[in-house]
């Protein structure tokens, strides 16, 4: 049986460990220390590292993990990932028979130019592109690129479990409620998220069904989001890219 465990790192990162009580994949290891401790405690044998993008809080632990376990490193072909042995582009497939797992690689640029996601068997590891009720900042791409990447992820089945890399959910929900105040799914989600955090339980994974109902960055064609974005910029916005760009910029400065 497959389990996905969140190893916490830094202030709010999750390093995901996909395992079957014997073998393990390590996803976006920004810090080796907590990973080494948990892997040792569980007596697991790592078989690969999977990276979504080059930012240090997703890759900083790779050299130590490779030194310890001598395992392959998968990552985006056009980004500098330390120790990368298997450069990937969208459309590639990965097979890990030890875990009976297969992943498809999706190109999802925007947060970084080469950002990729890993999708298979209802698991989506999407790094810093799609967050629970939010999305990543646009550092290397355009609003149009980022929206297209989010729409690509939103086209996956509703039951897909979303494993993003940061615990940003409550802040994202509070921003979403400003944009979409009468959305009953958001009101319910806020309560659920607050309760989980009170108990120190991760709010992830989310699901694409929940994201499509609550995430304003996936709902740029909805009247409530269009209205809020238009009011914020002081003019009517009539296309999803303009709405997306307006609310992404708003979120950058939202307190």
From Swiss-Prot:
Q: Name one GO molecular function term.
A: metal ion binding
Residues engaged in binding Zn(2+) 1? 53, 55, 111, 128
Q: What is its EC number?
A: 3.1.2.6
Q: How is the cofactor bound?
A: Binds 2 Zn(2+) ions per subunit.
Report the pathway entry. Secondary metabolite metabolism; methylglyoxal degradation; (R)-lactate from methylglyoxal: step 2/2
Q: Which UniProt keywords apply?
A: Hydrolase, Metal-binding, Zinc
Reactions catalysed:
an S-(2-hydroxyacyl)glutathione + H2O = a 2-hydroxy carboxylate + glutathione + H(+)
A GO BP entry: methylglyoxal catabolic process to D-lactate via S-lactoyl-glutathione
Q: Which domain of life is it from?
A: Bacteria
- Binding annotation for Zn(2+) 2: 57-58, 128, 166
Which NCBIfam families does the entry mention? GSH_gloB (TIGR03413)
Family stated for the protein in its record: Belongs to the metallo-beta-lactamase superfamily. Glyoxalase II family.
Description of how the protein assembles with itself and partners: Monomer.
What this chain does, per the entry, is described as: Thiolesterase that catalyzes the hydrolysis of S-D-lactoyl-glutathione to form glutathione and D-lactic acid.
Name of the protein described by the UniProt record = Hydroxyacylglutathione hydrolase
* Protein species of origin: Nitrosomonas eutropha (strain DSM 101675 / C91 / Nm57)
């Amino acid at each position: 049986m497959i389990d996905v465990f969140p190893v916490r790192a830094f202030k709010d990162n999750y390093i995901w460990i996909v395992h079957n009580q014997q073998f393990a994949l390590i996803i976006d290891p920004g810090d080796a220390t907590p990973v080494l401790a948990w892997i040792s405690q569980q007596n697991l044998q790592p078989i690969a590292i999977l990276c979504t993008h080059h930012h240090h809080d997703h890759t900083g632990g790779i050299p130590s993990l490779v030194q310890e376990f001598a395992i392959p490193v998968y990552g985006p072909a056009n980004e500098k990932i330390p120790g990368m042995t298997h450069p990937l582009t969208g459309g590639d497939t990965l097979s890990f028979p030890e875990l009976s797992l297969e992943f498809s690689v999706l190109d999802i640029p925007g947060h970084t130019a080469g950002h990729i996601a890993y999708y298979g068997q209802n698991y989506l590891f999407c790094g810093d592109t799609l967050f629970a009720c939010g999305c990543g900042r646009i550092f290397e791409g355009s609003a149009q690129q980022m929206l297209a990447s989010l729409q690509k992820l939103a086209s996956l089945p509703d039951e897909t479990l979303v494993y993003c890399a940061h615990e940003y959910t409550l802040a994202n929900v509070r921003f979403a409620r400003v944009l979409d105040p009468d959305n009953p799914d958001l009101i319910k989600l806020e309560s659920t998220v607050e309760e989980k955090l009170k108990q120190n339980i991760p709010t992830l994974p989310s699901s694409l069904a929940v994201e499509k109902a609550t995430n304003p960055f996936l709902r740029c064609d909805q009247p409530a989001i269009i209205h809020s974005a238009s009011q914020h910029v002081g003019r009517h916005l009539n296309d999803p890219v303009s709405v997306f760009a307006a609310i992404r910029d708003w979120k950058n400065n939202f307190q």
